[in-house]
Amino acid sequence: MKTSELFDLSRTLAEPLLRVCEYPWEALDDIASFIRTVGPTLGSDFERRGEEIWVARDAIVAPTAFLGGPCIIDHGAEVRHGAYIREKAIVGKGAVVGNSTELKNVILFDRAQAPHYNYVGDSILGYHAHLGAGAITSNLKSDGSNIVVHADPPLATGRRKLGAILGDEAEIGCQCVLNPGTVIGRGARVYPLSSVRGVVPARHIYKSRDEIVPIR
């Protein structure tokens, strides 16, 4: 579940931020400052829209979408009708942010997709990772305590807010809840309507809490 195990860092504008992090959630506190540093250096193929918002000229942003800064929308990304980008978001090349999807303090790698009624908060979606319709990343425990990643051994994150970390090409079924601190490995899949906690290994299928099997 280390950064290098989950992601091809060449697939994100945030590579300089993530490459110094042993675990990906360590980057979350620095997303805003990273955007504020990188944004003004982006070339003429980006336009500045309001305070601390940079949008590639070939990105598609619906007039009904809300963009809150700081954020960067990279080349070829699509931000659809009714999308809500609250703040602190890096949306990668060719990524999709869909109808009624909300982003807050996130990195979406290139071609990542949150296309239908998703909440993605304090989370990272790897290259070509996909959230099915209605899937959400829950980022706060009901008691407000700090989040532990339930690995072997458990990893204390020191964070009160942490959603999910999805490795490259992870596939999440419709209406899933990824509980705080969930990590989905590269190429892993999660069945629809699942409530997931802990770590799903790379190239495994999560069918239920007691049935996580390799992809054949």
For each of these PLM feature ranges, what is it?
Residues L17, R49-G50, G68, V96, ...:
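Short, flexible, glycine/charge-rich loop motifs used to bind or transfer phosphoryl groups or to couple energy/partner
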Residues E15-P16, L108, P115-R216:
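Glycine-rich hexapeptide-repeat left-handed beta-helix
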Residues E51-I53, C71, T182, G198:
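Residue "hotspots" at secondary-structure boundaries inside conserved domains
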Residues M1-T3, G43-F46, V61-A62, K93-N99, ...:
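Short, functional N-terminal and low-complexity linear motifs
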Residues E87, A95-G98, G158, L162:
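Short secondary-structure boundary/capping elements
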Residues M1-E52, R57, G187, L193, ...:
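Terminal amphipathic alpha-helical/low-complexity segments used for targeting or macromolecular assembly
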